[in-house]
């Protein structure tokens, strides 16, 4: 028999999901099936919907439970109506629209009433077509809802009709009852999951590390680097694809300016040569330091420093947050190059186009200016 849920049980499902509990565990707690839990969460993308306020004239769940009890006791419709101080016609319509006297169920009837109730007001993006067009254009450029919202506030401060919160964009994407933005546009988000995950959602561990010879630890970086006060201090890492393909990613700590470098291989010789060539193409003002993890690919860091003048600092083992700017940027890059993509098929020009898109996205941490604006204000980049 199909499992039905009370409003309290539904609320607990969303709360458990928000706290990082998986489908199977939630199902065990509520005595249900994982697929049922997924279906419930899917309709709103894992976002807990606001509790609907019912009009006084509408039947409540407790009244529906009394109707069910009265029907089981073979009471007449009129007797049930008298006990509830309701009109007999109200009780009669309620029973008939919910499978009749024999099969009436209070929880099912209440859930159906909630589904059938009209939304109190139209969705913002249903009403505002110019705003919807702008939001959709930016989503297709892989801007996040937060970037879209912040950019509108910064660039169109006097146009109050072009204001929207990030959460409204998320809800319009994920709530399937809202059709202003088709839910398939979720694919443009950084993480195109069918459900939004809570902050406590589990993640897989990081890859192994090696002992770097003569490597300078990150704790010896100057305060000036840590405080992001000047350009030219970079964080870097590799992003890997199928068929042993790799690219190197570099992010300036102050401006968040991104560079993507095509690699012939992951070995230290190939990586050292590619990074050396790239850094030597930059003006000296942008060649100050590089923070990397403890991967084998930068074992020739001393040669790199001699060739470029760029000091290399290494993170602690299993500590990706120590170069969090680069980790975040790699997540953005994965929008363009999902896992199981062969990265060798892309030319340097194509990688540069992706970097250009990232560098022209407004960032909240930059007060919704773009990395390109910040770095061009500090120094003119050369080709």
From Swiss-Prot:
Residues covered by the Integrase catalytic domain: 213-379
GO cellular component term of the entry, any: protein-DNA complex
Pfam family, one: HTH_38
Gene Ontology biological-process entries: DNA integration; DNA transposition; transposition
Family of this protein: Belongs to the transposase IS30 family.
Alphabetical list of InterPro entries matching this protein: Integrase_cat-core (IPR001584), IS30-like_HTH (IPR025246), RNaseH-like_sf (IPR012337), RNaseH_sf (IPR036397), Transposase-Integrase (IPR051917), Transposase_IS30-like (IPR053392), Transposase_IS30_CS (IPR001598)
Name the UniProt record assigns to this protein: Transposase InsI for insertion sequence element IS30A
GO molecular function, one term: DNA insertion or deletion binding
Organism for this UniProt entry: Escherichia coli (strain K12)
Protein task: Required for the transposition of the insertion element.
Gene, per the UniProt record: insI1
Record-linked NCBIfam families: transpos_IS30 (NF033563)
Keyword list, A-Z: DNA recombination, DNA-binding, Transposable element, Transposition
